[in-house]
Design a protein with these regions (language model features):
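Catalytic core of pol beta-like nucleotidyltransferases
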Residues: 1-29, 35-40, 49-102
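Short, well-ordered beta-strand segments
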Residues: 44-46
């Protein structure tokens, strides 16, 4: 799927609109092929959050909230702790685009 800059911006705004009202969400970062390709295969969304909920329940919750976006392009969502997140994969996420900060 080829996206125009306007379509890409609209999808970014839609991701934020779907997740910003969740009280635990602190930061949303988009990364991966969505940023670097004219024809991305999906949208990778890292949600930095402060919640005691487990990874699976948060991932399912965010996937449900992001269904309007997923109807246009596949979505991969990764909930991460706002503090203490570490690892090599985090470096790739940090190279992404921050689209929301609370």
């Amino acid at each position: 799927m080829t996206l125009t800059p306007e379509e890409r911006d609209a999808l970014k705004q839609q991701v934020v609109a779907c997740l910003r009202d969740e009280p635990e969400v602190r930061r949303i970062v988009l990364f991966g092929s969505f940023l670097g390709s004219a024809s991305p295969r999906d949208v990778d969304v890292a949600v930095f959050q402060e919640s005691e909920e487990g990874y699976l329940s948060l991932a399912l919750k965010y996937r449900r909230l992001l269904r309007p976006v997923a109807n246009r392009i596949p979505v991969d969502v990764i909930p991460l702790r706002a503090t203490g997140a570490t690892g090599a994969f985090l470096h790739e996420i940090e190279q992404g685009e921050v689209v929301y900060v609370r």
